[in-house]
Amino acid sequence: MLYLTKIRNAESEFTGNEQKIADFLRANVSELKSVSSRKMAKLLGISQSSIVKFAQKLGAQGFTELRMALIGEYSASREKTNATALHLHSSITSDDSLEVIARKLNREKELALEQTCALFDYARLQKIIEAISKAPFIQITGLGGSALVGRDLSFKLMKIGYRVACEADTHVQATVSQALKKGDVQIAISYSGSKKEIVLCAEAARKQGATVIAITSLTDSPLRRLAHFTLDTVSGETEWRSSSMSTRTAQNSVTDLLFVGLVQLNDVESLKMIERSSELTQRLK
C-alpha cells in the first residue's frame, strides 16, 4: 500500500503529534528532499523519536525510508496528473470543484501560519524588534509578492513614526542600500533567499554597517548567510503554483508580529499616532 494512502486511512488513529506529522508530510511532500527529521522536529515542536515512531507505525524502517518513498509517490502522482488534469496551483487541479479548492486553499494557509509560528525564536524576535526600534532609518526590500508584503509593512511602520524606504524599482533599492549607515536596518523579504537583486542589496547594506534582517525560508541561501538575523517562514506551496499565496500568508504573519511588537514597545505614543492617522483619513471621506 502507498504511504500517502496509509496516512489517509490511519488518520482516525493518530495522536495529536502524529496528526501534526501527517499534515506536514502531505502539505510539504514536494520539498521533502531538503527536510531532515531534526529540522521537521524543530518545525513541529516535537521530538525526533516521535517522527521515527510515526514512520515505523506506517511500516517503514525509519524516517529516511518514509521520506524517500513519499518523494517517489509524489513524482509518480505528478506524472499521472499531468496526463489527466491541469495543475492550477499547488495541489489544486482543473478537476477540483470550487468547494474542494476552497478547502485546499484554507488548509494550505492554515498550515503556513501554524508551521511559521512554530519556528519563532521569541528571544531573537525581541532583539530584532529592539534593533528596528532604534534604527534611524529602515529599508525594506523584496520582489513580486514579497514586495507587496514589504510595502504593507512600510505603511504600518510609517504610521507609528519610523523613517522607511520601500521602493519597487530594483535600481532604487540598490541605491538606497549603499547609502545606509551603522545603526540603520534593512529588512530583506525573499522566500527563496536567492534573488540576485535582494542579495546584492543585502551585501551593500552589510558593507555599510547596517543590520540586515531576512524574512526567508529555512533553506540555506545567500541571503540567509548574509543576514545578521533571520525570521523563518514556511509555505507548503510546490513548484505548481500560480501565485505565492501561502508564502505571502506566512510572510504577513511575521511582519504583522513585528509591527505589533514595535507598537507594544512604545505603546502610548504609537497609539496616539495611529489615532491621528485614523482621524485624518476619516476627514478624506
Curated annotation (Swiss-Prot):
Q: Where is the HTH rpiR-type domain?
A: 1-77
Give one GO biological process term: N-acetylmuramic acid catabolic process
Question: What CDD domains would the database entry show?
Answer: SIS_RpiR
Provide the alphabetized UniProt keywords. Carbohydrate metabolism, DNA-binding, Repressor, Transcription, Transcription regulation
PANTHER family linked: GLUCOKINASE, HTH-TYPE TRANSCRIPTIONAL REGULATOR MURR
**Functional description taken from the UniProt entry:** Represses the expression of the murPQ operon involved in the uptake and degradation of N-acetylmuramic acid (MurNAc). Binds to two adjacent inverted repeats within the operator region. MurNAc 6-phosphate, the substrate of MurQ, is the specific inducer that weakens binding of MurR to the operator.
Subunit = Homotetramer.
Query: What's this protein's name?
Result: HTH-type transcriptional regulator MurR
Q: What is the lineage of its organism?
A: Bacteria, Pseudomonadati, Pseudomonadota, Gammaproteobacteria, Enterobacterales
